[in-house]
């Protein structure tokens, strides 16, 4: 099994920003790693605590990643941590 990680940031916590960023991130990961969607078992997202307007996993589902399990979680608040960040791990 191959596991691929990635991350992106958004300019502001708005549903459209999250949808756009997640869609672009997953498209780039697919392209750069020559992934096929039917090979993906699961996608796990984490986001910083300043993102609360939309689930990244729901954005992935709406972007066409509906045949694998999807999960979103919130990262712990870390002093000096990157703001408005969405991270992903693809199995």
What are these regions (language model features)?
Residues 1-91:
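Terminal domain-initiation and capping elements
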């Amino acid at each position: 099994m191959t596991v691929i990680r990635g991350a992106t940031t958004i300019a502001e916590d708005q549903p459209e920003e999250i949808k756009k960023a997640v869609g672009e991130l997953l498209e780039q990961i697919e392209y750069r790693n020559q992934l096929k969607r039917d090979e993906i078992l699961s996608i796990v997202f984490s986001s910083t605590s300043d993102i609360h307007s939309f689930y990244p996993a729901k954005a992935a589902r709406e972007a066409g990643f509906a045949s694998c399990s999807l999960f979103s979680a919130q990262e712990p608040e870390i002093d000096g941590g990157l703001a408005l960040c969405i991270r992903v791990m693809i199995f």
